[in-house]
A protein has these predicted regions:
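N-terminal non-catalytic cap/leader segment that marks the start of a structured domain
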Residues: 1-97
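Glycine-enriched loop-and-adjacent helix/strand subsegments that border the catalytic/binding cleft
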Residues: 70, 76-180
Length: 180
């Protein structure tokens, strides 16, 4: 099932190129902000999923081209990114895994304008990435159990201000964590 947030942060299901509004299936879920709605859906998935499945039966929805897609996780409480672009630098073996935190305020929706920071970057670069949504508390998880913590996934663009990392050692913060 492909969940989307669209227009004024309404929950929908993408099927056959159309978006079906499923807000009615969230009856009883209390939230004030889109992020709270998303968290409620994830945490209550076992109860919400059957309601959504029933809601989409026989509904055509509207073409995806007629809606404005929003960020699927509007303000993630934690966004951890892996810094392992070894293929980009011509290395044959993966580099040692490094990670960095990205600010939730760096998240924008499809079609929104990414504001470039006023820094002396050598180039601003977008990198397509795969994001995993962790759906339950995950601390010291064994590799064999890791996927049981994944609620879903989506693609995103990681924006980088290249040429700044060397100025502060090997930190990715200055090059990747600007508000947008």
């Amino acid at each position: 099932m492909k969940l989307v947030l669209f227009n004024d942060y309404r929950l929908g299901v993408l099927q056959n190129g159309n978006v079906v509004d499923v807000m009615a299936s969230l009856d009883g879920l209390h939230f004030h902000k889109p992020q709270e709605m998303v968290e409620g859906v994830i945490l209550g998935w076992d109860q919400v999923k059957p309601k959504i499945e029933q809601e989409i039966q026989g509904k055509e929805g509207v073409p995806i081209s007629d809606v404005t897609l929003r960020a699927p996780i509007p303000r993630p409480p934690k966004l951890i990114c892996a810094a392992v672009n070894y293929l980009e630098f011509g290395q044959r073996k993966p580099a040692i895994l490094d990670a960095f935190l990205k600010a939730p305020t760096a998240i924008i929706s499809t079609g929104e304008t990414c504001e470039l920071p006023p820094v002396p970057a050598s180039i601003f670069h977008h990198e397509p990435e795969l994001a995993f949504v962790i759906g339950k508390t995950a601390t010291k998880v064994n590799q064999k159990d890791a996927l049981s913590h994944v609620f879903g996934y989506f693609n995103f663009l990681d924006m980088s201000a290249r040429g700044l990392q060397g100025a502060v050692g090997n930190s990715f913060f200055l090059g990747k964590c600007w508000d947008s």
